[in-house]
């Protein structure tokens, strides 16, 4: 007995091995997906890359050593064009060798190293904001699956009501057959509708299981078929003119800040950069080109550099501004469409209850006519189907409205 209790306790604490049998909300699904998605690990990689780049930039203050070796053979070498009597001047050898150690020390770079650090920080911020954009897109995928399951749940609920109603009609028509009011064909017509409804339930159940499996994969934990997805309750009302808070805007801002850093870096590069260098070498020839033998030598001096490419940054800034404007335009267009869709559904929902009431009255009247022998069972079943479709339409309108509200919420990031 103790062994059984221990085994059950162990199963309860194995991550990803238990079914979520209770209730779960949309926000919980979104958060679990964010935590489980493999892309989340790249946040640490971005931070580490930033640290490495900052360390590399800081090394610019340290002396830089470089060791090089060279061996070459020239097809021709420099020679004196004249002969001097009594003087034997040997020309340079065609095979030449050199080993050099160079030391460079930055004296003043006009703030170049400081700008490299700012650039590393700006690039890390751009990468981080891009990750935020990609991670935020997961919410849209979760929304589609979550509301897809809610729609299937409503259809399954209406399917169960229709099955109950058909079962009641089957017993009623059976009594009519016994009393000679209806015949076997009428009973078969009801049976066909029962079978069609049963097939539809199998299809809906299969679709729900597929959606649950996809949602489970995103979340990283198993959702059982008994899991109840709670209908979300919107906390605030949104419209087509609501403020846009999408992470893409922060990404655009980070890119703009990065271009500002690059522009400031260009200003730094316009300033003279000074550094000392010392080269010590051993080779043949040495600095004396006319001496054909291995010899050591050194060179010391001051180095100056200057560069310029400002137009590239201006083009990138214009492209970034264009991308931002296009994003805002498309987002506003999408918000307008979503807002109009929600308002249209709300207007339709105003008549749903009345349509159901009227369809119910028509179906009851049809049943009474069947009992009196003035209406066929097939015609009565048609009215029963119409009533069921009216109830399904109301349920779908409610879920579609919720989905539209949360699509608008996703589009604006509210």
Question: What do these predicted regions represent?
Answer:
Residues 1-27, 34, 413:
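Bacterial Sec-dependent N-terminal signal peptides
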Residues 19-66, 181-183, 216-262, 328, ...:
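Bacterial Sec-pathway N-terminal export signals of envelope proteins
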Residues 41, 64-83, 93-94, 104-133, ...:
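Small/polar (Gly/Ser/Thr/Ala-rich) solvent-exposed segments
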Residues 42-57, 134, 138-157, 211, ...:
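Amphipathic alpha-helical coiled-coil segments
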Residues 96-98, 144, 189, 273, ...:
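Transmembrane beta-barrel architecture of outer-membrane proteins
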Residues 6-7, 27-30, 223, 393-414:
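Acidic, low-complexity, intrinsically disordered peripheral segments
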Residues 24-25, 52, 134-245, 387:
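Periplasmic alpha-helical coiled-coil/stalk elements that build and connect Gram-negative outer-membrane
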């Amino acid at each position: 007995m103790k062994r059984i209790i221990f085994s059950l306790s162990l199963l309860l604490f194995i991550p990803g091995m238990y079914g979520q049998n209770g209730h779960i909300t949309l926000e919980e699904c979104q958060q679990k997906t964010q935590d489980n998605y493999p892309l989340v690990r790249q946040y640490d990689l971005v931070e580490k890359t930033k640290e490495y780049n900052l360390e590399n930039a800081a090394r610019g203050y340290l002396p830089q050593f470089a060791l090089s070796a060279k061996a070459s053979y020239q097809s021709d070498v420099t020679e004196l064009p004249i002969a001097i009597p009594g003087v034997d001047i040997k020309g340079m050898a065609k095979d030449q060798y050199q080993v050099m150690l160079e030391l460079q020390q930055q004296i003043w770079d006009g703030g170049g190293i400081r700008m490299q650090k700012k650039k590393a920080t700006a690039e890390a911020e751009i990468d981080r904001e891009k990750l935020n954009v990609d991670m935020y897109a997961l919410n849209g995928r979760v929304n589609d699956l979550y509301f897809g399951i809610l729609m299937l749940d409503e259809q399954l609920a209406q399917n169960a009501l229709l099955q109950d109603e058909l079962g009641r009609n089957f017993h009623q028509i059976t009594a009519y057959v016994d009393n000679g009011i209806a015949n076997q064909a009428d009973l078969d017509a009801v049976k066909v509708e029962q079978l069609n409804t049963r097939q539809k339930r199998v299809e809906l159940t299969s679709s729900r299981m597929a959606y649950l499996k996809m949602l489970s994969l995103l979340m990283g934990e198993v959702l059982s078929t008994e899991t109840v997805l709670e209908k979300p309750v919107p906390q605030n009302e949104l419209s087509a003119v609501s403020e846009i808070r999408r992470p893409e805007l922060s990404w655009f801002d980070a890119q703009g800040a990065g271009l500002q850093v690059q522009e400031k870096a260009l200003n730094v590069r316009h300033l003279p950069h000074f550094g000392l260098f010392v080269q010590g070498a051993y080779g043949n020839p040495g600095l004396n080109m006319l001496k054909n033998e291995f010899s050591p030598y050194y060179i010391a001096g001051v180095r100056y550099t200057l560069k310029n490419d400002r137009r590239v940054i201006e083009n990138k800034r214009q492209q970034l501004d264009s991308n931002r404007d296009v994003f805002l335009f498309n987002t506003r267009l999408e918000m307008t469409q979503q807002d109009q869709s929600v308002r249209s559904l709300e207007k339709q929902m105003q008549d749903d209850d009345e349509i159901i009431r009227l369809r119910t009255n028509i179906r009851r009247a049809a049943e009474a006519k069947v009992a009196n022998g003035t209406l066929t069972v097939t015609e009565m079943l048609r009215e029963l189907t119409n009533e069921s479709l009216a109830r399904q339409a109301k349920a779908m309108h409610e879920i579609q409205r919720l989905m539209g509200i949360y699509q608008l919420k996703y589009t604006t990031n509210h």
